[in-house]
Each structure stands twice: as structure tokens, then as C-alpha cells.
Amino acid sequence: METAKDNTARTFMELMRVPVQFYRTIGEDIYAHRSTNPLKSLLFKIYLYAGFINFNLLVIGELVFFYNSIQDFETIRLAIAVAPCIGFSLVADFKQAAMIRGKKTLIMLLDDLENMHPKTLAKQMEYKLPDFEKTMKRVINIFTFLCLAYTTTFSFYPAIKASVKFNFLGYDTFDRNFGFLIWFPFDATRNNLIYWIMYWDIAHGAYLAGIAFLCADLLLVVVITQICMHFNYISMRLEDHPCNSNEDKENIEFLIGIIRYHDKCLKLCEHVNDLYSFSLLLNFLMASMQICFIAFQVTESTVEVIIIYCIFLMTSMVQVFMVCYYGDTLIAASLKVGDAAYNQKWFQCSKSYCTMLKLLIMRSQKPASIRPPTFPPISLVTYMKVISMSYQFFALLRTTYSNN
């Protein structure tokens, strides 16, 4: 079976399968414009908006809980505990809002990538698609596992713990606790019916936040992987071109095609920035605070809380690293085009060819990148800055809390 699969060309939709399927579980259909069933599309949209209305009501409850907790130093620990969850929720909200606001850009981006996708197995081997897909799958699997592990442990640990204590350890009462610290305008634990309705309501809200947070980044990973594959193919074509001196017309036609191809890839990068720039800005600002507050919880809590928050900490750090890694990979792949052009046997070609090649090299010196507003292009240097900033906040918070 594996051999048969390896001998089959991969479609673009197969590469997009994970984010598309996960998005549909919360009602977001990226390819709704291709749907032939308007009723199904309408139901998806109703489910999506109803879910986000419910989710944002829960976020308001978290914000009220946070505000009430910071009024007294005795409850400041509770405020610190809920703060990273609020940050995660706001980033998920903003990412989904960016997807909705930039839906036309997203459709255009995905359609262009699908049109550029190599269709035959032979062509995909030329593009080294299997190598890019292998790395992409590993990243997607790791991040998906961590993100779902975080939302699952926070959502279901209190119920599992209470069930074990009540059913197996002989406790007289079932502890009606929730996985998230939320203020309610009523007593949400006064009886079993209300408690379980609210419990599953919160669990759905947590799942929706996790999927909105996860899928926006998975979509970014798939898109950047595809763009890097195209930049890499351009580099290989440039390096392998023979540049025969007696084939000037063919050389110029080849270079014109490469320049157009390169320009198309750069435009795709601009679409990515239009779609992601503001959400990534909020993501990095929140990530510093999230990692700080989570680290504080890990150093100041019980073993069971430490385990839960360690999963959250790993999720936050891996998410930031993943975005920075792909930002760095995009920069490297686009810069490689200029190096490949210079490594050609261009000295055998005509002056017109060399002039065009020079323009291509000059353009490639400004690398394609992911650029949040006011931030430098995202790279692994950005990751180090985020971690450094988080540690500074953590040290300040720890010192302030200890002194009081």
C-alpha cells in the first residue's frame, strides 16, 4: 500500500487536508465558494457564528474574573492563572477575524498556489515535493498534538479528577469544578443539569479556540512550504541552466519565464502578509506575556497544575518557534535565488541576458518574508527576542510577587 501511495502524484487538496478538515469541525469552510450545496454552507456559517458568540461570552467571563482577581493581592495568583488563557483566546479570536476579513485574499492565494502546484509525479519529484511534504507533516503533527492536548487537559481534567475521587476513592461529593476560571452571572454549579450544560459549553468554546488558533498556523505552514518549494525550484532551474553561448534567444526566453515565475512567488508572499501581518503582531505580543505567566504558574503551583501548564507552555513556545522557523526558511529560500543566478555560467551569455540576470539578482537581495507591522521580518532571531522578553517579564513578576 505504501509503494502504491508513493507512486501517486499528490494533489494540492491532499496537502491542505489537515487545516481544511479541522476548520470544518468548527464551521469554517475555506472552500465554501466552491460548494454546490448552499444549505450545507449556510448551516456551516450558522454553526461557526453561534460558536464564536458563545466563545466570546466565555472570554468576557474570563476578563471579568481577571478584573475581580486583581483587586486583592490575596487573589492575584488567580489573575495570573487566567491571564494566559485570556491571551490564547484573544489571539484565536483575532486570527479568525483576520481569516474572515481577508477571505478574498485567502481564496486568491490558495487558488494561485493550486494552479502552480506540480500535477504529475515526475514534476513533483523535480520540485522535491516529497521532501517538503515530509517536513511539513512532522511540524503539523507535533503542533496539532500539543494544541489539542492543551485544550483537552484544561477542559476535561477537572471532570476526570472529580469522577475518580467520587467513584473510586470514596469521596462523598462530586466536585463541580471547571477547567477554566470564568465568572458567571449565576451559580453555574448549583445542580448537575446546569453544571454539565455549562461544562460542555466551556469544552466546546475551548475546542473552538484551539482549532481557530491551530488552523490559522497550519494554513500558514502549508502556504509557506509551497512558496519555499517554488523558490527552491527556481534556484535549481537557474543553477542547472547550461547558458550555451550559441542559444541566446532560448536563454533570454528561459530567463523571462524565470523572472515571471519569481515575481509570482513574491506576490504570493505579499498576499500572505496581507492576510497574517496584524494577527501575527498580536500573536507575538501576547506570546511574550503568555509564556511569562505560564512559567510563573509552573514555578508556583502544585504538581498537577504544573503538568497541565507545562503542556500549555510547550504549546506556546512551539507555536512561536514554528512561525519563526518558517519565516526564516522563507527568507533563506528567496535569498537562494540570487545565489543560484550568480552561480550560473552567465559569462557565456549575451549582454542583454546578463543585464536581465543582474536585475533578478538585485531583486532577490530583498528577501521575501513575513512582516508584522512595526516588527522586523520574522526569523529565528525573532524567536530569541520573544523568549528573552518573556524571561524578563517573568523575572520581574517573580521578584514583585516575592517582595510582597
From Swiss-Prot:
One of its GO terms (biological process) is signal transduction. The keyword Transferase does not apply. InterPro entries: 7tm6_olfct_rcpt. Interacts with Orco. Complexes exist early in the endomembrane system in olfactory sensory neurons (OSNs), coupling these complexes to the conserved ciliary trafficking pathway. Keywords: Cell membrane, Membrane, Olfaction, Receptor, Sensory transduction, Transducer, Transmembrane, Transmembrane helix. It holds the Pfam family 7tm_6. GO terms for cellular component: dendrite membrane; plasma membrane. Expressed in olfactory sensory neurons in the antenna. Odorant receptor which mediates acceptance or avoidance behavior, depending on its substrates. The odorant receptor repertoire encodes a large collection of odor stimuli that vary widely in identity, intensity, and duration. May form a complex with Orco to form odorant-sensing units, providing sensitive and prolonged odorant signaling and calcium permeability. The atypical heteromeric and topological design of the odorant receptors appears to be an insect-specific solution for odor recognition, making the OR/Orco complex an attractive target for the development of highly selective insect repellents to disrupt olfactory-mediated host-seeking behaviors of insect disease vectors. Odor-evoked OR currents are independent of known G-protein-coupled second messenger pathways. Residues 1-45, 101-139, 226-277, 327-373 are cytoplasmic. Its main location: membrane. The chain crosses the membrane at residues 46-66, 80-100, 140-160, 205-225, 278-298, 305-326, 374-394. The lineage of its organism: Eukaryota, Metazoa, Ecdysozoa, Arthropoda, Hexapoda. It is found in: Cell membrane. Belongs to the insect chemoreceptor superfamily. Heteromeric odorant receptor channel (TC 1.A.69) family. Or49a subfamily. It is a multi-pass membrane protein. GO terms for molecular function: ionotropic olfactory receptor activity; odorant binding. This is Odorant receptor 67c. Residues 67-79, 161-204, 299-304, 395-404 are extracellular.
